């Protein structure tokens, strides 16, 4: 019996070492050598080295001088340990009510915005972690941000244009804007004194969720 079991046990041990140890270590080593920033989580740092967040995971912004991210259904919001969408169908009454409430809140906070509220500002992504919004969603918020910063709207629009990322490989996906990067660019152009809101760190604050 042992004669029949030995090849199977040997194969299990070999595959465990190969796929559970050697392969992950090799992939990690190659990633750290070829893509050190991405392998470390695409972290964004302040000049003093303090981590402000990741370019891959969104954050919640609520202050008027910042661009706001799309809603998140991941835990209490952008919780990577609870990545998820709402799992509610488009006709679900709870989803319809939530979207309508978001529309009204955004209109109240953006009285000078032109046109309907962009859909990505009132709907969560499938992961709940999306760090991007559409250029249209950023432009829709531009009047509010410009007023809060004391800037001309055209200057804010130019920052949006500079922060817009094109399609992957030129044809995959749609143009998008990384909200954290855009807000940091705003701080660099027109810093404003502020206090962080409890549970909602803003750019420049050394807290990552």
UniProtKB/Swiss-Prot annotation:
The chain crosses the membrane at residues 11-31. It is a single-pass membrane protein. GO terms for cellular component: plasma membrane. Residues 188-209 are annotated as: Disordered. Residues 197-209 have a biased composition (Basic and acidic residues). InterPro entries: KdpC (IPR003820). GO terms for molecular function: ATP binding; P-type potassium transmembrane transporter activity. Pfam families: KdpC (PF02669). It is found in: Cell inner membrane. Keywords: ATP-binding, Cell inner membrane, Cell membrane, Ion transport, Membrane, Nucleotide-binding, Potassium, Potassium transport, Transmembrane, Transmembrane helix, Transport. Its main location: membrane. The keyword Transmembrane helix applies. Belongs to the KdpC family. The system is composed of three essential subunits: KdpA, KdpB and KdpC. Part of the high-affinity ATP-driven potassium transport (or Kdp) system, which catalyzes the hydrolysis of ATP coupled with the electrogenic transport of potassium into the cytoplasm. This subunit acts as a catalytic chaperone that increases the ATP-binding affinity of the ATP-hydrolyzing subunit KdpB by the formation of a transient KdpB/KdpC/ATP ternary complex. HAMAP family: KdpC. This is Potassium-transporting ATPase KdpC subunit. It comes from Rhodospirillum centenum (strain ATCC 51521 / SW). The lineage of its organism: Bacteria, Pseudomonadati, Pseudomonadota, Alphaproteobacteria, Rhodospirillales. The gene is kdpC.
